[in-house]
Amino acid sequence: MATTSTVSTSSRLQDAQPAFIYGTAWKKDHTKRLVKEALVAGFRRIDTAAQPRHYQEHLVGEALREAYSEGIVTREDIYLQTKYTTPAGQDLSNMPYDPSAPLDNQITTSVSSSLKNLRQQDSVEVATYIDCLLLHSPLPTIEQTLQAWKLLESYVPNQIRALGISNVTLPILQAIYESSSIKPSVVQNRFYPQTRYDVSLRAFCAEHGIMYQSFWTLTGNPALLKSKPVADLTLAADVGRPVALYALVMDLGTVVLNGTTSSGHMHDDLSGILKVQEWATMKPREWATVSASFRGLIDHSQI
């Protein structure tokens, strides 16, 4: 019987909580401090990966355990996701599994490492649960991708609550969806012109209740930052251009990866989205106009 997870796909701008997920890539030894700062600022979704080349998953776990013990958050407050990364995405001298092992062994070893790194308490060996585990990318063949997915299904719903995939095309996502018992709950992709902003893929996600997460939202979109809808919202809501772009992307039904290393920006981004929400509530017609203008740019890549 096909099932889906309980991951909420709601991410419109009007949501009470800004639709950000804190990204922990490239934070190196600063990971623990930055994750705690993000939690203090108000972030409640955390993204990491079992990929020591770019992520320090164990430091994410340390930050979370300290935050739990200090009463900053409870485990139930947090949405926590990590990833299995194939050998092609790893530093072969520092990875969480043996790249020469069979695929199933690679995955089970990686997942075991993540469960230990992200455990809720120091005194227990494994995490109570991980909210979502993503394939960091499709595997070299669709057959291998489906094999990996089937193995991950065995962890749901106990140690892993939901499954997802990153860096995926629509045909591969459709193949997974059609072949799986546990349907994809999350897709995390670059949001930029080269993929035409994943218009068709995002439509598929919306139709099937899949949370679409964007990364490279700022760095991949210098033209969008300069676009008229972003400029208009910046002026009308009295926020910075990055916040205006974030808000408009969220209104597409997207959860935005935010990896800022500035505590000030953490607070400003969260409070800025709330400021746009307030303005949109007070000025619904003006908001509808700027939102429609932005959607026109995205849907037709007119930038």
What is each model feature region?
Residues 58-72, 110-123, 202:
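Short amphipathic alpha-helices and their capping/turn segments at secondary-structure boundaries
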Residues 32, 54, 101-108, 142, ...:
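Non-membrane alpha-helical structural segments and their capping/turn regions in soluble enzymes
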Residues 1-17, 30, 69-70, 93-94, ...:
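Eukaryotic N-terminal low-complexity, Ser/Thr- and Lys/Arg-rich leader segments
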Residues 74-89, 132-133, 191:
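A short, structured active-site edge motif that brings together acidic residues
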Residues 1-78, 88:
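N-terminal binding-site loop/beta-alpha segment at the start of enzyme catalytic domains
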Residues 112, 119, 123, 127-131, ...:
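Beta/alpha (TIM)-barrel catalytic core signal, keyed to glycine-rich beta->alpha loops juxtaposed to Asp/Glu
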